[in-house]
């Protein structure tokens, strides 16, 4: 029996040798059909959802980038606005400081002027008061000196100077002599 098997094998036409890397045609056909079905399902169901998720992520990332850029631009604008306000405040402070300094100098000048005027007024009032006191003292002294000179003249002359005209003339002569001596001494 073994011989018949060999004989049958020898009588069969020879086929090409079997390559283990290339599968038979029926395997290829039956493998392509499920692959096509899986590919169709993948293309119609999975791939659109995957594309949708990718689009959402891309939009979210781009939106985040745009929001970040907008926030950055807003922050830059706020910084510029802050710097501008700070510069304006510094300018205003410098102007206020200069105005205050100018007003202070005006106040000092006004106060000096007022003090000088008040000082001059006080000195003038003092001079007037001194002049009035001097005139009063001179009048009192003239009166006393007149009386003393009359008393002295009466003692020297030994006569009474009752006559007002004589008395007045004697006093005037005596005081005129004193004034001449006082002005000559200066």
From Swiss-Prot:
It is a single-pass membrane protein. The chain crosses the membrane at residues 28-48. Keywords: ATP synthesis, Cell membrane, CF(0), Hydrogen ion transport, Ion transport, Membrane, Transmembrane, Transmembrane helix, Transport. Gene3D superfamilies: F1F0 ATP synthase subunit B, membrane domain. Pfam families: ATP-synt_B. InterPro entries: ATP_synth_B-like_membr_sf, ATP_synth_b/b'su_bac/chlpt, ATP_synth_F0_bsu_bac, ATP_synthase_B_chain. One of its GO terms (cellular component) is plasma membrane. F(1)F(0) ATP synthase produces ATP from ADP in the presence of a proton or sodium gradient. F-type ATPases consist of two structural domains, F(1) containing the extramembraneous catalytic core and F(0) containing the membrane proton channel, linked together by a central stalk and a peripheral stalk. During catalysis, ATP synthesis in the catalytic domain of F(1) is coupled via a rotary mechanism of the central stalk subunits to proton translocation. This is ATP synthase subunit b. It comes from Corynebacterium urealyticum (strain ATCC 43042 / DSM 7109). The gene is atpF.
């Amino acid at each position: 029996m073994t011989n018949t098997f060999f004989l049958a094998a020898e009588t069969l036409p020879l086929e090409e040798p079997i390559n283990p890397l290339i599968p038979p045609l029926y395997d290829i056909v039956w493998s392509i059909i499920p692959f096509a079905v899986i590919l169709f399902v993948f293309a119609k169901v999975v791939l659109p959802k995957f594309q949708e998720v990718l689009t959402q992520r891309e939009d979210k990332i781009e939106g985040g980038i745009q929001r970040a850029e907008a926030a950055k631009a807003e922050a830059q604008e706020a910084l510029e606005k802050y710097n501008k306000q700070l510069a304006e405040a510094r300018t205003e402070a410098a102007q206020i400081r200069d105005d205050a300094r100018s007003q202070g100098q005006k106040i000092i000048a006004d106060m000096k002027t007022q003090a000088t005027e008040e000082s001059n007024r006080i000195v003038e009032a003092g001079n007037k008061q001194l002049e009035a006191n001097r005139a009063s003292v001179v009048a009192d002294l003239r009166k006393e000196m007149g009386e003393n000179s009359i008393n002295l003249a009466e003692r020297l002359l030994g006569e009474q100077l009752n006559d007002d005209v004589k008395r007045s003339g004697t006093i005037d002569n005596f005081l005129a002599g004193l004034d001449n001596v006082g002005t000559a001494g200066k």
